[in-house]
Amino acid sequence: MKLSTRVTGLLNVKYPIIQAGMAGSTTPELVATVSNAGGLGTIGAGYFSSDRLEQEITYLQELTDLPYAVNLFVPSDKLYIPEKVEHMNAWLKPYRRAFNIEEPVINMTEKQQFKDAIDLVIEKGVPAVSFTFGIPEQTVIEKLKERHIKLIGTATSVEEAIANESAGMDMVIAQGSEAGGHRGAFSETASQLTPLIGTMSLVPQMVDQINIPVVAAGGIMDGRGLVASMVLGAEGVQMGTAFLTSDESGASQLYKHAISQSKETDTVVTNVITGKPARGIENEFIHKMNEYDDEIPDYPIQNQLTNALRKEAANKGNAQWTHLWSGQSPRLVQHMSAWALIENVVKQANEIMNR
């Protein structure tokens, strides 16, 4: 078994290791370090304005001339329903008051934001783009392919993987249920729930059904996870939580400490924080929101309704009222540079393969 795969060839990287596009937690330093170490660094641009994204890309290009990716959230067709928003605002009012937070103004601008981001990655010559929450329109895919930009889809089921391949993605992330942060799902099960299929189950089933390369994600923290994924047929891995505690991560010390102190049983998948299912460390905010007796507003509305509250809690060092996205392998986190992390992953993988 070799670490040279179709993924390394398509992305023009040394190692089949992708740093997940963790919106809100990536920095140009993290992305550049991963790319310079031989992996594929990713700008988590899901929440960025076009101005902010341009700044990030421009600075990143000063730090590396190696391939990197930009991760974008595919906009949804969810509607703004005033009654839902009013009810949620009433529920959040006492908690906002406790943190001295004003009621936010909701901006339904994600479609324009996505369009601007696509135009920008083309203009700036970004080597690769990964997508979360769905598949972009065919015109967008064709426009990116004309510029030879590599496209990375996200799937939480075989059905979603097939859809990604049919749409023209160059490779697909098999996001297992162990993964931290938002579920990349864009389909629902018969019970109208997001698919929650473990990485070990998802990867080989996906590999058997599609021809484009599969990249395993979810709970992968070290060389053991890389080798195991490749044995299952994956041609690379995407790691998120492992990079959250790295020196270059944009995660706060509060956040890093919470992950370091948590156990594999401490995370839950919930939609109460942003309106989309996401895996994070269970805390008081989630407990309180679970008492809400109405339907949670959809993403991006719920995300905007709770955003300022979560930010202020984090600023005040209160881990109980912010989001703490994390995968199910927190006992395996390490505190080191992203470069050292990649070196360790590769070294351990090679040792295992050479036994």
From Swiss-Prot:
Binds 1 FMN per subunit. P3N is a potent irreversible inhibitor of the key enzyme succinate dehydrogenase in the Krebs cycle and electron transport chain. P3N has been shown to be a toxic metabolite to bacteria, plants, fungi, mammals or any organism that uses succinate dehydrogenase. It is an enzyme of class 1 (oxidoreductase). It catalyses: 3 propionate 3-nitronate + 3 O2 + H2O = 3 3-oxopropanoate + 2 nitrate + nitrite + H2O2 + 3 H(+). Signal peptide: none annotated. Belongs to the nitronate monooxygenase family. NMO class I subfamily. Pfam families: NMO. It comes from the Bacteria. This is Probable nitronate monooxygenase. One of its GO terms (molecular function) is nucleotide binding. Keywords: Detoxification, Flavoprotein, FMN, Monooxygenase, Nucleotide-binding, Oxidoreductase. InterPro entries: Aldolase_TIM, NMO. Its cofactor is FMN. Nitronate monooxygenase that uses molecular oxygen to catalyze the oxidative denitrification of alkyl nitronates. Acts on propionate 3-nitronate (P3N), the presumed physiological substrate. Probably functions in the detoxification of P3N, a metabolic poison produced by plants and fungi as a defense mechanism. It comes from Staphylococcus saprophyticus subsp. saprophyticus (strain ATCC 15305 / DSM 20229 / NCIMB 8711 / NCTC 7292 / S-41). PANTHER family: NITRONATE MONOOXYGENASE-RELATED. FMN binds at N71, Q175, G180, G219, Q238, M239, G240, T241.
